[in-house]
Structure formats: C-alpha cells, structure tokens
Design a protein with these regions (language model features):
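Conserved N-terminal alpha-helical segment that immediately precedes and caps sugar-phosphate-binding
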Residues: 1-198
Length: 198
C-alpha cells in the first residue's frame, strides 16, 4: 500500500507503537542517493531532539559501513526517486534484515525497492516535460516528506514546541513557491539568455 505526505503522522505513530515493547526508537537514518533532499530532516533531528540520534548517509556507504546501533530500534528513511538505484535497494533490504522500520520515499507507484519497505510514501513531483509546470503540492514533495518524518518523530517521542507553527508554514509553502516563481520568471529567463553560453 502506498501513502502520501498526509499519512506521515499516523505512520510514525504506528512505528512508535510497534517498537515500544522493545525499547522504542533510538535513532533515525536518512539514506539514499538523493542526499540533498534529506539534509533538512537530519539536521532537524540533530537540533531539536535530546534523545534521538540521527545521521545522513549515502546508500552504498550505509551498506558497507553500517552503524553499530542500526537495528530494531531504528528507522531508516530512504529516498529513491524511481525506486531502481541498486545501492539504495540494498540499503532498504538491510533495513528489513536488521528489523528496522523501513520508510521509502519514492515517486513511482511501482518499482524494485517497494518490496523492502514497510511504508512506501509517494511524494509529489513536477513531471512536466521541463519540470516547470509548478502545479504540484509542494508540501508533499520529497524534502518535505523527509522533514515531516523527522518532525513527527521528535514531536511524538519528546514534544516539539513549534509543532503548530511548522504545520501552519507547511500549509503556506505551495503558494509561496508559486508566487516566487511568477515574481522571478522574467529575470530568470533574462539570466538564462545572457549566460547560456558560459
């Protein structure tokens, strides 16, 4: 079964409930080839949690240099756009083998990686020919989904003082991005024309 960004609160709640009798969740690993998209989530946990350990690791490095504390008290949140990156598939498989809760962020409905996920979250993506249509829900794109996992994990394990403000801001992000795109469109086109051969 696939999930969307609006399901993340319940996904985290379910994971915490499943893991409570074995000591709960102690750490979360953000893993993938799309590391840039995962950085805000890793940083959020590092800055806002007093009890959770967080790391941000390339898929291949994670497989070949797995952290010692990775196991049944872990969440691994993987980003794999088309679900076919061999190293990320191996990292997801390792998560299953170690008993971690495996969350996969992906765009495609069907792919190789989904068999290794406990929760498959399909994020929004602008699939228009030039990726510039801008008609997606930006609150549901990959970076936001990873951040939602982080925010919900911290909030549900130890509380997060700015939780309501976070969701208020998340509700504004699509309009902010659309307005910004309109505002800079002419300047962006002029810049591209001027520097296209540099």
């Amino acid at each position: 079964m696939g999930y969307g960004s609006k399901d993340i609160k319940n996904i985290v709640k379910e994971i915490l409930e499943e893991k409570k009798d074995i000591g709960g969740i102690k750490n979360i690993y953000f893993v993938g080839g799309s590391l840039g998209a995962l950085y805000p989530a890793k940083t959020f946990v590092e800055r806002e949690s007093q009890v959770l350990r967080s790391a941000w690791i390339n898929s291949n490095e994670f497989v070949h240099s797995t952290p010692k504390d990775f196991g049944e008290n872990s969440i691994i949140c993987l980003a794999c756009h088309k679900g076919n990156t061999p190293e990320t598939i191996k990292a997801a498989r390792l998560g299953k083998e170690k008993g971690a809760a495996v969350i996969i962020l992906t765009w495609l409905e069907e792919s190789e990686i989904i068999e290794f996920g406990d929760y498959i979250i399909h994020y929004t993506f602008d699939a228009s020919p030039d990726h510039l249509a801008g008609d997606i829900d930006y609150a549901g794109e990959k970076t936001q989904c990873a951040l939602l996992v982080a925010v919900e994990l911290v909030a549900q394990t130890e509380g997060y003082a700015n939780y309501d403000k976070f969701y208020e801001a998340l509700g504004m992000i699509s309009n902010i991005i659309r307005n910004a795109r309109t505002h800079v469109a002419a300047r962006a086109e002029a810049f591209a024309e001027e520097y296209q051969n540099d």
